[in-house]
Swiss-Prot record:
Record's keyword terms, sorted: Oxidoreductase
EC supergroup of this enzyme: oxidoreductase
Free-text disruption phenotype from the record: Leads to the accumulation of chrysophanol.
Coiled coil: none
The name this protein goes by in its record: Baeyer-Villiger monooxygenase dmxR6
Role of this protein: Baeyer-Villiger monooxygenase; part of the gene cluster that mediates the biosynthesis of the dimeric xanthones cryptosporioptides. The pathway begins with the synthesis of atrochrysone thioester by the polyketide synthase dmx-nrPKS. The atrochrysone carboxyl ACP thioesterase dmxR1 then breaks the thioester bond and releases the atrochrysone carboxylic acid from dmx-nrPKS. Atrochrysone carboxylic acid is decarboxylated by the decarboxylase dmxR15, and oxidized by the anthrone oxygenase dmxR16 to yield emodin. Emodin is then reduced to emodin hydroquinone by the oxidoreductase dmxR7.
Entry GO MF terms: oxidoreductase activity
Family: Belongs to the AflY oxidoreductase family.
UniProt pathway annotation: Secondary metabolite biosynthesis
Enzyme Commission number(s) of this protein: 1.-.-.-
Pfam family, one: Questin_oxidase
InterPro entries: Questin_oxidase-like
Gene it is expressed from: dmxR6
Length: 446
């Protein structure tokens, strides 16, 4: 029994979208998404090599992309991809055994086999039930896959969020297979330890602001110095989790959400505001503006937690857990990129003649034209979501919890557009912004 092919519905084309999405764009997007699904691997290389085609196409579609723009962005992503691996049919027939499935988790060569397994499960049970069983059920398998959802700078959970947001079973299957075949930087240990500590500590009557926890990360020498430049791409595994795992879990455990719908909504908005703030406020005095590559992912993924908390078929306590894990990992990622010094002026005072007059619709139009893998479009769309979700909390009793205020959202979106436009992929962002080394790039000289 095969999963339904991708068929985008005009009524489910994103929670942040333009008013009119061309019908021929839906048709083109369906075709390109199926071609990617059938022909290409989820990973263009075994480590840190995610196929971004789905993310890019669905994001720009929601921002009003034409069929040509969709094809152009597809073409941007194709050169680095590799063919989807062959299905191991012998293993496929055994994956319904939980022990065998558990042993297969983390095997990137089995992506296609896992994809076919999850497509079968979705065809038999429905995509919502498959998510319940394999992500949310709090079994050993579900907790293992849930932790892997947050691996790779949130790529699997972004994929899952898109599958839910656009209500596409095949995209959900891809997300499950991506998480199940993903490598491991041991963030599951961080989640487990933080959750255990939160479970035995007495909850504070007034929650500590996430931005205060960010400041505590920077002030904690054990955590701040844990990632080293020489760790390169393993700063999470070897640095924050490896050298400061206990301290990081203890600090992260302080981000807690009561099982209350309004508290969940506010806390999700707080997470979004905090991520946007440290992404934009982490500049380097005397150098050109540039957004950190990893902090950018904290923002792009944040939109999907707005999607998750709106799913009434997911139990409240499970939606709470999804957001708690996101914020706790955000704190760790802030440390991974060097616990950069933060200053609101970099966002609030941002001005550039090239973009000062641009509104959201102008930015959507501009970013859809960019040769990109979707990161800039995702970032801008997530900021628009943040503006909408956070505005009611930015003044009044929760003001101190929300560092992004008013037009800072639009200014940060303009900064993204200005600093990524017409640049090659390796110069659109800066990696590990809290370290001095990446800021020595010649293109960042004032």
């Amino acid at each position: 029994m095969a999963a339904s092919p991708i068929s985008l519905d005009p009524s489910h084309v994103g929670i942040i979208k333009v008013a009119n999405i061309p019908s021929d764009s839906l048709t083109e997007c369906n075709k390109l998404l199926m071609k990617n699904h059938e022909e290409y691997h989820m990973f263009f290389r075994d480590t840190a090599g995610h196929n971004h085609i789905v993310h890019s196409l669905l994001t720009i579609l929601s921002l009003g992309a034409s069929p040509k723009q969709l094809q152009d962005r597809y073409d941007d992503g194709i050169p680095i991809q590799r063919p989807i691996p062959k299905i191991d049919h012998e293993l496929l027939e055994k994956l319904s055994d939980p022990e065998i499935l558990l042993k297969t988790i983390g095997e990137i060569t089995q992506y296609h086999t896992l994809l076919e397994f999850f497509k079968r499960e979705i065809a038999a049970k429905g995509w919502k039930e498959a998510i319940q069983e394999y992500v949310l059920a709090r079994t050993k398998i579900a907790d293992t896959i849930l932790a892997r959802m947050y691996e790779g700078a949130y790529h699997p959970i972004i994929h899952l969020g898109l599958g839910i947001e656009f209500q596409q079973p095949i995209i959900v299957a891809e997300a499950l297979a991506q998480a199940a075949s993903h490598d491991n930087s041991n963030i599951g240990t961080l989640f487990h330890n933080a959750e255990a500590e939160a479970g035995i500590s007495y909850p504070s009557r007034i929650p500590k602001p996430m931005i205060e926890l960010i400041n505590e990360v920077r002030a904690n020498e054990t955590i701040r110095t844990a990632p080293r430049w020489t760790d390169f791409g393993n700063k999470m595994r070897d640095g924050v989790v490896g050298r400061a795992g206990e301290a990081m879990a203890s600090l992260a455990a302080q981000f807690r959400i009561r099982n209350d719908e309004e508290e969940l909504k506010r806390s999700t908005a707080e997470m979004i505001s905090t991520c946007a703030f440290f992404a934009g406020a982490s500049q380097h005095e005397g150098r050109k503006k540039k957004i950190d590559f990893f902090y950018m992912h904290n923002v792009t993924s944040s939109l999907f937690f707005t999607v998750f908390i709106r799913q009434d078929w997911i139990k409240l306590e499970d939606r709470v857990r999804l957001v708690e894990w996101k914020a706790r990992l955000d704190l760790a990622w802030y440390a991974v990129s060097g616990s950069a010094a933060l200053d609101a002026k970099w966002i609030s005072d941002y001005s550039n003649p090239a973009s000062d007059g641009m509104g959201w619709e102008d930015l959507f139009t501009a970013v859809n034209e960019e040769h990109d893998d979707g990161h800039a479009a995702k970032f801008i769309r997530a900021l628009k979501n943040g503006e909408q979700e956070c505005s009611k909390y930015e003044q009044g009793e929760w003001a101190d919890y929300f560092p992004m205020k008013g037009d800072m959202w639009l200014k940060l979106a303009r900064m993204c557009q200005d600093t990524t436009t017409n640049r090659p992929p390796d110069l659109k962002w800066v990696p590990f912004t809290g370290f001095d080394q990446p800021w020595k790039r010649p293109d960042l000289a004032n």
